[in-house]
Amino acid sequence: MPILEGAGVTKHFGGLAAVSHVDFSVDDGQVVGLIGPNGAGKTTLFNLISGALVPKEGAIRFRGQEITGLKPHRICRMGVARTFQSVQVFANLPVLDNVLLGSLFGTRNGMSAEDAAGEATRLLEFVGLSAVRATPAKDLTLANQKRLEVARALATRPELLLLDELMAGLNPTEVAQAMALVARIRDQGIAVFVIEHVMKAIMSICDRIMVLHHGQKIAEGTPHEIATSRTVVEVYLGE
């Protein structure tokens, strides 16, 4: 059953259709990939889902309830969390405090400070950052800053997590660790919608993949179907 659905979602910037009449869905417990060349509209679609942008046309529903045009904080508290293409952490705050902010803000609004601290500590262990809990976020490696963003997003207690290029800029070992983290998140019962350019990763972790090109959905299917799609190959290789 879909946890997230979009119908005819459209967003223009001036005369440019960044996202054009796109339908999409993410089912409970699924990892769904979103791929496409740079400028295809992937991050714009995430911004529309999360409330950072408002569609010109179309509707977006979460758990059957329309969220089109709601403010980001309302969508977050309904159970949708995200990370960002460019890492956004509170640079001068310790790692633990970054996650605490998510715990205090999320779906269980009103959590006590003691419970929030316990939840933040658990999540740092979950993503592998327990050893650097007192380190300022600005002093982390890129890979660990990305893990911190994931932990902070998870601290809001989401049912759906949007991951925007979690693996960009990582070395092969870090990519493998990130793939394992996504699998663990799915095993926690959280649906994941992931933008990624690391094709080996996207083909390995996703149940289904959607392809955008010039703001339009041009293909959707299993990893095997996408990997063997002539349309997708032409978009990526220019044949």
Show the residue positions of the predicted features.
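Glycine-rich phosphate-binding loops of nucleotide-dependent enzymes
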Residues: 1-239
